[in-house]
């Protein structure tokens, strides 16, 4: 298990999109810069030449965490993330290579009679349980201004690729992992009404994932970083939560875009160690 990851200070709102790929004029790429995940950008078709984008940030930034949120990519889709040092996109400084959008499950995950026994792919029903979110942590980071993301989903039955939000931000990973007792669960948003007879009626709504954990053994410099994360993020700004980046099979379950539900103080329970707690609620 890798140490938990918090992405913060999303830089996408200051980005400028270049003319690249083919995107709808009624659902343009600028929709990605809104916080409403349902307000999407949509490609004009599903051709690989259309489903790609370029953007420049307001200045050179060190980007350590990336997410594509509320997309519609299907089980055979792949994608690629690249970083450049020049506006002509000719000097490459980072290349993720081609990555599967959805994981392949280990052989034996499904019963012989299951249609997924051989292809080992998640079903559409499994995928629909969660907000469709791609998360990516580059293995090396560079200070750069120019970014390119490509999606390869030409057989998408919708006939296009659409995206609700992009997260490109800073990253924090504690030197010592969160303490035992960390949790991640679902908090219902369903409304329950009770009739005079006692019968219950439900307005079912998507639940929000909530992560709670404590960092008990922070060095002094980490205590400063965590204080800065609280200050920068408040309870309104987006954070990207990744429970364990090494478990690629479950990233769609245990990584999400959220916000801090409360701001916790930095305490000093030991002579040279500091402590803080996090509660992160998923944004829908």
Region roles according to the model:
Residues 1-51, 56-78, 82-284:
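Extracellular/virion structural assembly segments
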């Amino acid at each position: 298990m890798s140490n938990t990851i918090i992405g913060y200070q999303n830089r996408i709102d200051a980005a400028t999109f270049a003319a690249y790929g083919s995107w709808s004029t009624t659902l343009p790429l600028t929709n990605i810069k809104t916080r409403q995940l349902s307000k999407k950008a949509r490609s004009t078709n599903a051709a690989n030449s259309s489903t790609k984008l370029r953007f420049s940030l307001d200045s050179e930034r060190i980007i350590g965490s990336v997410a594509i949120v509320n997309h519609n990519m299907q089980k055979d889709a792949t994608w690629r993330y690249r970083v450049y040092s020049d506006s002509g996109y000719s000097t490459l400084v980072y290349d993720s290579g081609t990555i599967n959008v959805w994981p392949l499950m280990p052989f034996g995950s499904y019963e012989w009679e299951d249609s997924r026994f051989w292809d080992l792919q998640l079903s559409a029903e499994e995928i629909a349980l969660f907000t469709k979110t791609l998360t990516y942590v580059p293995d090396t980071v560079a200070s750069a201004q120019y970014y390119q993301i490509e999606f390869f989903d030409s057989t998408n039955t919708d006939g296009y690729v659409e995206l609700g939000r992009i997260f490109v931000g800073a990253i924090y990973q504690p030197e010592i992992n969160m303490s035992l007792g960390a949790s991640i669960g679902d908090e219902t948003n369903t409304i329950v009404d009770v009739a005079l007879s006692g019968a219950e009626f439900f307005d079912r709504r998507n639940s929000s994932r909530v992560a709670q954990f404590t960092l008990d053994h922070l060095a002094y410099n980490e205590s400063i970083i965590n204080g800065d994360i609280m200050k920068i993020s408040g309870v309104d700004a987006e954070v990207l939560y990744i429970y364990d980046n090494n478990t690629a099979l479950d990233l769609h379950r245990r990584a999400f875009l959220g916000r801090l539900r409360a701001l916790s103080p930095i305490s000093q329970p030991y002579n040279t160690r500091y402590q803080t707690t996090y509660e992160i609620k998923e944004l829908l």
